[in-house]
Amino acid sequence: MPTPVTTARECLTEEAARALDDAVVVARRRSHAQTTSLHAVSALLAMPSSILREVCVSRAARSVPYSSRLQFRALELCVGVSLDRLPSSKSPATEEDPPVSNSLMAAIKRSQANQRRHPESYHLQQIHASNNGGGGCQTTVLKVELKYFILSILDDPIVNRVFGEAGFRSSEIKLDVLHPPVTQLSSRFSRGRCPPLFLCNLPNSDPNREFPFSGSSGFDENSRRIGEVLGRKDKKNPLLIGNCANEALKTFTDSINSGKLGFLQMDISGLSLISIEKEISEILADGSKNEEEIRMKVDDLGRTVEQSGSKSGIVLNLGELKVLTSEANAALEILVSKLSDLLKHESKQLSFIGCVSSNETYTKLIDRFPTIEKDWDLHVLPITASTKPSTQGVYPKSSLMGSFVPFGGFFSSTSNFRVPLSSTVNQTLSRCHLCNEKYLQEVAAVLKAGSSLSLADKCSEKLAPWLRAIETKEDKGITGSSKALDDANTSASQTAALQKKWDNICQSIHHTPAFPKLGFQSVSPQFPVQTEKSVRTPTSYLETPKLLNPPISKPKPMEDLTASVTNRTVSLPLSCVTTDFGLGVIYASKNQESKTTREKPMLVTLNSSLEHTYQKDFKSLREILSRKVAWQTEAVNAISQIICGCKTDSTRRNQASGIWLALLGPDKVGKKKVAMTLSEVFFGGKVNYICVDFGAEHCSLDDKFRGKTVVDYVTGELSRKPHSVVLLENVEKAEFPDQMRLSEAVSTGKIRDLHGRVISMKNVIVVVTSGIAKDNATDHVIKPVKFPEEQVLSARSWKLQIKLGDATKFGVNKRKYELETAQRAVKVQRSYLDLNLPVNETEFSPDHEAEDRDAWFDEFIEKVDGKVTFKPVDFDELAKNIQEKIGSHFERCFGSETHLELDKEVILQILAASWSSLSSGEEEGRTIVDQWMQTVLARSFAEAKQKYGSNPMLGVKLVASSSGLASGVELPAKVDVIW
């Protein structure tokens, strides 16, 4: 029985009750008999400042290739359509509110129970005594907060289905409601105080600009991000959003005006800036400006841009765009229109930049001007924190807010280590530029690692497989005992250790003078030194001596053993303090050496030459791939270069994202063979090989995909096998939800599972394939072929027969077959026509969907580490060789006068069997077909010759019988002879 609205309202807080009242208004306006969860969702989405609306907009904005505005509109449309399907009440409208449905009341009850189970909201639980004995709530009522009310509504199956139709996942929305993104959280600290900043929460920046030289560059991280947007070909007009957006814009404009342009790209290094924030405020102040006056001011701006002659362009600073969301004003509409015309006319030289302080302001701006994002070519750039360089030096004073961990400042831990570094340190270093770069990278990596996970987790779980070695028990003991050190002491000690390490390396390799003393105070050693780290890792081909240097068994001359420059950071353990006794490069002790020798470890050593290691790995990997995929020589070379380059390149955009490799063009079998070989080389076998096909029709019927998308299945497999090679076939056919998650994965190196949990892809090699070749993509068959790859891969196992008859009839059929084959070869691919769709959808929807997928695929493929285009396999030549071999066996039995006709299905079956055996690991794949011809086919030819003899009028035809169809591609053990 439905519950009265007044009774349900007593169970809610004031904010949640207002949301329920809005839902009741929606139900009454639509003449619905009851107020359901859908009405509540509709009301929450309509509220400008509701949590659900902000979360949905934020979630949609994470979809890179699509407009967040469009996806949010799709959600509103789906909710509206679902409400339209609900039956309307036939009774005349009354003053009573539509009662709360059983499902919505059950959601309120669930939210009460859920709120009781969360201790963090205990201090907010308000227990109110109620004297009325209403049937909806108990005498003691727990007021439900809006957040828990929304979470329970999202559990409703109908709401879940509606969100799914719009491309959202209720589980992800619930996760964002519980833990809002940073852009949402920042609003909590906007009133009079800034969010607390810990060192572990500072935004990541370029390693070369990080601690301990953060104050030396003078460039702001947000300014660098803005410069990257301005250097783009499209979407080059940044719109900064966030609490710190105004500050970031001011820092950027000050840098441009003062001539500090080092953070800009070379092609826009001469950028100039014009600020019109005051002019916009004056125009909109009283609204008295007419169209002519506004047009004259905008024309003056256009002339200024044309007369500047700046090759790098001009940026027009619009300032805070909140002024554009003011009350209706004719001058406002005219100004936006004229600025759009100016940008369209001067698009090559002119760029816009502006900021808004909150997502709510941005939403109001889009509501006011729906096309402004497209007209101004805006690129939304979230600014969640200030990135100004610290003015407190390298080691600020210890305090509660400055410690690495909360409450760390309560413990007295005065460091005995003073590092008087300043902005001029770079000029006083005696290391060469290359060694100094690597030193800075290792310092940045140490600090970044120390601020999140423990050493054991960081080293054992996060290192890529090719940088792992076996972790001895002694190492683990040292690591465990070091966790009680104060973080500031540890960081200072590591910095000094890294300085000495790279001093020794540079002195021994590049013969540079000794590093000048900077006045470090002596520190007594607390832990032994380790210059090589041993970590256990899965069995991998790259860990064998074939690809890496042999382990060090005894000390050798300094020139051979000095660890040289390595692009992928292998730093000292976080818990170790290096002690230099003046012996130069420090080696492991003999005791440790003997123990590791008994355990037979495979140490990952640093070669004295990075190029030597790269060449050795490259040649070994190329040799293995060439044996498996011998017909794709150029592609194999490119793949080996990309993978080995990623192993040794620290300049990659996201080193924590594993390796992403795109294989484009034809040869589906060759691509799959490459992925399988990589799993054998890097992870020890096919057990760590995950393969899915976005274009497969059987995915919806397979039990393992039931209730899941393709990416859901992949995340489940990666959670069980974190060290794997993932093959994603036909990635251009991915559905919209999978596209969003793949874009997030390639950008962040992390992929979300069904429940919103994040799975790291650092130790994963992702191979994405597509039949589209981006260099010469075409939908037409340029060269006519008789045996295209699609037909070979779709071949089936038929029962083969040898038919004998009149040669004249066979000849006629043969000529007809050849004619049809030639005609089919030159046909152009046609668009797919779905007869189940209405005419208007058939004409427009597929084209629009294809354009969206193409746009996403183009942007996604640019983010991978490397692209390799495969060449088509010449199946016609292989078929010709098969025909010649069959003809040779036939002539030995019947002679050259008897005519033989081969059915096309027979050629396809033999061709597919030969190709599958060649690509499934058989080095002598062709010998399998040759043996079958000798033992089976030739014997059947001899049997036919013995039964029916040989004469010129006899015709022989090798055909495929449809009665013997079998799954897979196999050659029959017997060929029947019939007349």
Curated annotation (Swiss-Prot):
Gene Ontology biological process terms in this record = response to strigolactone
**What factors induce this protein?**
Up-regulated by strigolactone treatment.
Entry annotated with the keyword Flavoprotein: no
Places the protein is found = Nucleus
- Provide the alphabetized UniProt keywords: Nucleus, Repeat, Transcription, Transcription regulation, Ubl conjugation
Motif (EAR) positions are 833-837
How is the protein modified post-translationally, according to the record?
A: Ubiquitinated upon strigolactone treatment. Probable proteolytic target of SCF(MAX2)-mediated stigolactone signaling.
Q: Which InterPro entries match?
A: ATPase_AAA_core, Clp_N_dom_sf, Clp_R_dom, P-loop_NTPase, SL_signaling_regulator
- Disruption-associated phenotype: No visible phenotype. Suppresses max2 phenotypes associated with strigolactone-D14-regulated growth. Smxl6 and max2 double mutants have branching and inflorescence heights similar to max2 mutants.
Show where the Clp R domain sits. Answer: 8-190
Provide a Gene Ontology MF annotation, just one.
Answer: ATP binding
Task: State the residue spans of region: Repeat 2.
Answer: 100-190
> Which CDD domains does the UniProt record give?
RecA-like_ClpB_Hsp104-like
Expression (tissue specificity): Detected in roots, seedlings and axillary branches. Expressed in the primary rosette buds and expanding leaves of adult rosettes, the vasculature of the hypocotyls, cotyledons, and mature roots, and in the midvein and petioles of young leaves.
Please give the GO cellular component terms listed in this UniProt entry. nucleus
Matches recorded under Pfam families: AAA_2 (PF07724)
- Outline the subunit composition: Interacts with TPL/TPR in an EAR-motif dependent manner. Interacts with TPR3. Interacts with MAX2 and TPR2. Interacts with D14. The interaction with D14 occurs in the presence of (2'R) stereoisomers of strigolactones, but not (2'S) stereoisomers.
- Please quote what the entry notes about the protein's domains: Contains 1 EAR motif required for the interaction with TPR2.
* Role description: Probable component of a transcriptional corepressor complex involved in branching control. Regulates cotyledon expansion and lateral root growth, but not germination or hypocotyl elongation. Promotes auxin transport and PIN1 accumulation in the stem and represses BRC1/TCP18 expression in axillary buds.
The Swiss-Prot or TrEMBL record describes its family as follows:
Belongs to the ClpA/ClpB family.
| Name recorded for this polypeptide | Protein SMAX1-LIKE 6
